[in-house]
Swiss-Prot record:
Family as reported in the entry's similarity comment: Belongs to the UPF0235 family.
HAMAP family: UPF0235 (MF_00634)
Domain of life from the UniProt record: Bacteria
Name recorded for this polypeptide: UPF0235 protein DET1292
GO CC annotations on file: cytoplasm
Classification via SUPFAM superfamilies: YggU-like
Length: 97
């Protein structure tokens, strides 16, 4: 498999075991996301990638959790999404557009 291009990375704070998946905004420089899945056996991590893929219209294969696989603070890499596109999509979602 060929090496991927340099990704755009974002710092996230994940709150597992929520009632539903939800993007809630920024807190202390981290994008805060609630995930309904339990934090066991990678379920919350898989649910996070699934949610981000759907939310940002980006293939799951282009999203990777780089750091924080077992913690709430994570670094996620996007290989096919630029920082500008990411920020525009997140801003639109947070505004309710």
């Amino acid at each position: 498999m060929p090496a991927k291009e340099s990704p755009f990375r974002v710092n996230l704070k994940i709150l597992p075991s929520a009632q539903r998946n939800e993007l809630t905004g920024y807190e202390n420089g981290l994008l805060k996301i609630k995930i309904a899945a339990q934090p066991e056996k990678g379920k919350a991590n898989k649910a996070l990638v699934d949610y981000l893929s759907e939310l940002l219209d980006t293939p799951k294969s282009e999203i990777e959790i780089c750091r924080g696989l077992s913690g709430r603070n994570k670094v996620v890499a996007f290989y096919s999404l630029s920082q500008a596109d990411f920020e525009a999509k997140i801003s639109a979602i947070l505004r309710g557009s």
